[in-house]
Swiss-Prot record:
This is Probable porphobilinogen deaminase. PANTHER family: PORPHOBILINOGEN DEAMINASE. One of its GO terms (molecular function) is hydroxymethylbilane synthase activity. Its EC number is 2.5.1.61. Tetrapolymerization of the monopyrrole PBG into the hydroxymethylbilane pre-uroporphyrinogen in several discrete steps. The gene is hemC. Pfam families: Porphobil_deam. SUPFAM superfamilies: Periplasmic binding protein-like II. The keyword Transmembrane helix does not apply. It comes from the Bacteria.
Length: 241
């Protein structure tokens, strides 16, 4: 079935390596790694396919003050990436799936399997050798995570924290917090080895650890390609279209 894509009038040039597949991404290290991950998945099936990753700064990257609960279900982290797709500067947009609003600017053509849905609590490494304080200072911006933390640590002081993984780890290291919450998928993708962690119990975000891929043209071709290659796990992507 893959041979059909070599004859597809739109996809053939990508599959044959005649032109680059241009992927839009946020600028963070994690976002760029996710774009490379998408590219590698396709290259398993189309070895001659090659790509260019074009990054942009999103509103969510520039605004480090607004609580995430105030921008839930908006394009805070996705609209600027999808603008590159809609304007024809890129062919596909690569997103963390849980950043998607209900009605994204571009059309979702694939949602991948999660590499790990779990949340982890990352403690300051000093707690490898000393007991945890009774009133933990925990950094988290997610309403869902805050509710869980309040049950697990009733005496904890839970404070908003924003920024890239590296920024949040720096805040932890500088002792602004005793612990911070992270997605284990992000830690894995970045190849981080964190010495003092605890896996939090469910519930987890249903899209955590998944990538969402968006397009603005040739939607049927892209959806067929990702589905045939086994890259799409969640076939109910029409709910985001």
């Amino acid at each position: 079935m893959l041979s059909a894509y070599y004859n597809d009038p739109f996809l053939a040039d990508f599959c044959l390596g005649n032109i680059p597949l241009r992927l839009a991404s946020r600028q963070s290290s994690l976002a760029v790694l996710q774009a490379h991950e998408c590219l590698r998945k396709l290259q398993i099936f189309f070895p001659r396919l090659w790509g260019q990753i074009i990054t942009t700064t999103t509103q969510g990257d520039l605004d480090q003050e607004t609580p995430l609960c105030a921008v839930e279900n908006t394009g805070f982290f996705t609209d600027d990436v999808d603008f590159l797709v809609q304007s024809g500067q890129c062919d596909l947009g690569i997103h963390s799936a849980k950043d998607l609003p209900e009605n994204p600017k571009a059309t979702v053509v694939s949602i991948t399997a999660s590499i790990d849905p779990r949340d982890i609590l990352v403690f300051h490494e000093k707690y490898l050798s000393i007991p945890l304080p009774r009133r933990l200072r925990i950094g988290s911006s997610s309403v869902r995570r805050k509710e869980l933390l309040s049950l697990l640590y009733p005496s904890a002081i839970i404070t908003d924290i924003r920024g890239t993984i590296q920024t949040r780890l720096k805040l932890l290291e500088e002792k602004n917090f005793d612990a911070i919450v992270m997605a284990n998928a992000a830690v894995s993708r970045l190849g981080l080895r964190l010495p003092c962690t605890k896996i939090l119990p469910p519930p987890y975000h249903p899209l955590q650890g998944r990538l969402a891929i968006t397009a603005s043209r040739h939607i049927r071709s892209w959806r067929g390609l990702f589905l045939t290659c086994g890259i799409t796990e969640d076939v109910e992507i029409m709910c985001f279209s």
